[in-house]
Amino acid sequence: MSLFVVRHEHFAEKCPAGNPEMGPMLLKHVSPQGAQPFGVTVHGEAVLDGRHTFYLILEAPDEAKVMEYMGPFGQVGSVEVWPASTCEQVVERAKC
């Protein structure tokens, strides 16, 4: 399993948090139960207040699984995925 950092951004007009159908669906999607069918583990998530930007720290078999999991977010905005490492891994290999 590999670690990934994901950023999703959308326009205010398309904010899923304000949509009475989409908001609850996305909450369920980022839950452990929602991520499990994709083989993804959510280690953390946060939204930048007022910026319509959502970050996730995910563990998954590969980037393709992350993109599949992030599909609903891609319907309302952009999705960027970066391979990542824990601080412990970086120190062990002595480089970022």
Task: List each language-model region with its residue ranges.
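Conserved short beta-strand edge segments in small beta-sheet-based binding/regulatory domains
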Residues: 76-88
